């Protein structure tokens, strides 16, 4: 997906998000675990497509075992028909998180989750814009993510949807700079795509070409 948004500066290295540490907790999809109260929402501005009036925001925490993410997406129509993991979820409503722990390596982790709670976790080697996603091997036990979603409705009318997920450090093996400790910095970006009226995109940091423009990712600093 490409973006053009006049007036929005591109300053990814100066965009530092502090990530607070937490104890591990249960993923439910509601985002109501008390641990989420430790941190504030960060907004994802709409970056492409027709104006929607929808808001998108996210939270992130880390523990001794992995990374926790929470997205809240206002919406009026859920566009999601794919009913299995590892499909092209980005062709329907989806949220995405990209983590690039070591800038010296053109290798990062991408995670996608649909409103129907189907996932796409992949490792991505990216050589000067040539990239392809690779599925995890032995994806079971302690290497598996935990994820859940929730669609909020008023009667039959959709109001929003929430995505909550946990990515274990063991799944990120053998990426360098993992697990993070206090003071560790990773590059990262967070996105949403919605298909109510064509495709609309939201991004934490504005990229030049597509979601895989890792040189334009923002910075996470673990607290």
Briefly describe each language-model feature range.
Residues 1-223:
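Structural preference for beta-rich elements and adjacent junctions enriched in aromatics
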């Amino acid at each position: 997906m490409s973006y053009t948004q006049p007036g929005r500066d591109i300053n990814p290295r100066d965009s530092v998000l502090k990530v607070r540490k937490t104890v591990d907790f249960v993923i439910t999809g509601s985002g109501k675990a008390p641990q989420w109260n430790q941190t504030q929402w960060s907004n994802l501005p709409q970056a492409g497509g027709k104006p929607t009036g929808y808001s998108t925001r996210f939270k992130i925490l880390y523990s001794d075992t992995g990374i926790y993410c929470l997205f809240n997406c206002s919406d009026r129509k859920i566009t999601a028909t794919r009913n299995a993991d590892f499909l092209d979820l980005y062709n329907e409503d989806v949220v995405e998180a990209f983590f690039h722990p070591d800038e010296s390596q053109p290798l990062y982790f991408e995670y996608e989750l649909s409103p129907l709670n189907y996932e796409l976790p992949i490792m991505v080697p990216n050589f000067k814009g040539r990239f392809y996603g690779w599925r995890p091997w032995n994806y079971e036990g302690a290497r598996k993510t935990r994820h859940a979603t929730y669609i909020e409705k008023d009667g039959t009318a959709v109001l929003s949807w929430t995505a909550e997920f946990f990515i274990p450090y063991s799944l990120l093996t053998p990426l360098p700079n993992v697990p993070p400790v206090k003071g560790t910095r990773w590059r990262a970006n967070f996105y949403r795509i919605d298909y109510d009226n064509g495709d609309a995109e939201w991004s934490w940091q504005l990229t030049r070409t597509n979601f895989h423009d890792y040189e334009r990712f923002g910075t996470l600093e673990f607290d």
